[in-house]
Amino acid sequence: MIEKSMPAQNTHAADADLIGPDKSLLIVDDDTAFLRRLARAMEARGFAVEIAESVAEGIAKAKTRPPKHAVIDLRLSDGSGLDVIEAIRGRRDDTRMIVLTGYGNIATAVNAVKLGALDYLAKPADADDILAALIQRPGERVEPPENPMSADRVRWEHIQRVYEMCERNVSETARRLNMHRRTLQRILAKRAPK
């Protein structure tokens, strides 16, 4: 167990021991400042970091050298991080992947987990949260959130889940939710509630 009084470099050395022998980490995010900051923080914790700023670059790096660990933003400027997850999983089935999302869209995050991601974290996640998620052992319990979702947020997430299940078909989603199509379009156009 790491004591809080340990110096930072000893803590990071202990982190490196928890990572395992293959320390490769691919971080895919189109927010350059966040990407570089996270890459430095994860290198300090013992990872051998490679970065990609797009889906295309992430897939290319995954094909060239499939990583043991990956942190992937869900929404990238040229597409979905789900494509990077599929590319990694197609090359290496033991990769520990975490999905980052600035939108907190549970339906899409569930799809990411089904494709092989371990977990998803809301942005901006800090390096310690990401490290904890990457090294979490199977069966370990994660602390529940201190402030659960509001009723409006739960409704939004349900609508998003059905929307994803209907392959983003507004008319079909509206029919399944017993809602007028224009009402659904207005809801989807708004930002997610807190």
Curated annotation (Swiss-Prot):
Recorded GO MF terms: DNA binding
Keywords: DNA-binding, Phosphoprotein, Transcription, Transcription regulation, Two-component regulatory system
PTM field: Phosphorylated by ActS.
Domain Response regulatory: 24-138
Gene3D superfamilies the UniProt entry points to: 3.40.50.2300, Homeodomain-like
Annotated positions of the 4-aspartylphosphate modification: D73
Biological function: Member of the two-component regulatory system ActS/ActR acting in acid tolerance. These data implicate that a two-component sensor may be involved in pH sensing and/or response.
Name of the protein in question: Acid tolerance regulatory protein ActR
Species whose genome carries this gene: Rhizobium meliloti (strain 1021)
